[in-house]
Amino acid sequence: MNVDYKSVVELVLNCKSLILNNDKAHQITVKGLADYVTQVDFSVQSYLTGALAERYPDIQFLGEEGQKHTLDWSRPVWILDPVDGTTNLIHDFQESCVSLGLWDGHELVFGCVYNPFHEELFEAVKGRGTYLNHRRVTVSDRPTLAKSLIMVGTSPYDKGRADQVFDKIKRLYVASEDIRRSGSAAIDLCTLGCGRADGFFEYDLKPWDYAASIVIITEAGGTVTNEKGEPIFPGERSAIVASNGHIHQEMLDLLAK
């Protein structure tokens, strides 16, 4: 599969004006409990799917917005979240991003996460390392959970599991130096990938939430698994446990209690 990743990143950067269009950010459709989509989401997805399909017509699409259909995972798939952090966007809380990953039929090989509010571009190609604004970055080297900053996520869509979710988060909070949450899983995962944080946990994420960031973290030297320590398949929802590698087993053991 021959993909010009530099040109793909340029397409993602072109989404800046679409995301910063405040008028479209307030054209809101309610999909479910605390689950929103704005005209920005539709505009970004329409632009990227159109541009990528023109250049790579044989690559399939999995996107947050739009019709879901059966995919052939033995073939390449773009995995797109046009706006990760839609609720943030609606509230003008400036932690939202475009997240684009590529599955080559066997594994995730490319990830790009772009936050236009802070002009931060994370990108990684398998075997080539991870870059933040074209500067190579790696995960931290903190050796213990007690000295680590942990990113956590909570879903507003299923508050019936709040006690179960927050029990796990409480364990991490007590055992670590502290916890943080931005409201965007992709941004939180990239915060780990560039060494600003040391671990990440969220109970239930969809493929477009995490696909790009898995490449960004692993190419930066980190580890990403489910709660059982197993590899992630990007065709399904999953709990995500990610770390700098040093504290991974400690996190898994704590979450399993």
Name each model-derived stretch.
Residues 1-83, 246, 253-256:
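N-terminal subdomain of lithium-sensitive/metallo-dependent phosphomonoesterases centered on the IMPase/IPPase/PAP
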Residues 138-257:
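An extended, acidic
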Residues 15, 19, 41, 52, ...:
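Residue-level signal for inorganic ion chemistry
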Residues 28-29, 53, 68-71, 113, ...:
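Short secondary-structure boundary/capping segments
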Residues 41, 64, 81-84, 88, ...:
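Acidic active-site catalytic centers that drive phospho-/nucleotidyl reactions
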Residues 72-131:
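DPxDG-like acidic metal-binding loop motif
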